[in-house]
Amino acid sequence: MRIGILGGTFDPIHYGHIRPAIEVKHALALDKILLMPNHIPPHKQQPNLTTAQRLNMVADVCSQLDGFELCDIEAKRDTPSYTVVTLEQLKALHPEDELFFIMGMDSFLQLKSWYEWQRLFNFAHLVVCQRPGWQLDAAHPMQQILTARSHAHQETHEGHAKNTHKNSGQIFPVTITPQDISSTQIREQLAKGEIPADLLMPITLDYIQNQRLYLP
């Protein structure tokens, strides 16, 4: 099975998360996508909502999307959500499956600042999405890693048959439709009493309004 993994604060989850995940799922013929809320994001400030509230919103979204599932492995953890630890645990749970960890180009450019980033490739492939406003310069130090581990490059240089059974360690660049949406933007609109109906799934907006979340 080919399993995509998209982690994030999801504070709240919105179309800027969902639409790229759907595009990646189709582009790479993934069997399912795990949406994985962080508990203690190492690279971000603490979220505005409780972990339980964010889990509820993501679970609601997954109930509406075919092939999407909630993954609460990080939300249950009492220590920082380091990606390499999470992927190691997920690989132990899915030893025969291919894991595809989804990230944006902005995160990929900061990859060397991640805890034990080199070990990520032991457990999963990386899917690098092209987001609005980011373009990797040919001279950027991450370009060498992107080229050396790109799926297309390894297919060309090592042969298709050899890579057919390689279930981790490659990078899959995927061009996605620009989604200029941010959780900060949504929270600000909600705090002003605006209804960002075009940015959120209806089930998410209903939950936010029923729970009276993000009010000033």
UniProtKB/Swiss-Prot annotation:
Belongs to the NadD family. The keyword ATP-binding applies. SUPFAM superfamilies: Nucleotidylyl transferase (SSF52374). Keywords: ATP-binding, NAD, Nucleotide-binding, Nucleotidyltransferase, Pyridine nucleotide biosynthesis, Transferase. It comes from the Bacteria. It catalyses: nicotinate beta-D-ribonucleotide + ATP + H(+) = deamido-NAD(+) + diphosphate. Catalyzes the reversible adenylation of nicotinate mononucleotide (NaMN) to nicotinic acid adenine dinucleotide (NaAD). The keyword Kinase does not apply. NCBIfam families: cyt_tran_rel, nicotinate (nicotinamide) nucleotide adenylyltransferase, PRK00071.1-1, PRK00071.1-3. GO terms for biological process: NAD biosynthetic process. The lineage of its organism: Bacteria, Pseudomonadati, Pseudomonadota, Gammaproteobacteria, Alteromonadales. The gene is nadD. One of its GO terms (molecular function) is nicotinate-nucleotide adenylyltransferase activity. Pathway: Cofactor biosynthesis; NAD(+) biosynthesis; deamido-NAD(+) from nicotinate D-ribonucleotide: step 1/1. This is Probable nicotinate-nucleotide adenylyltransferase.
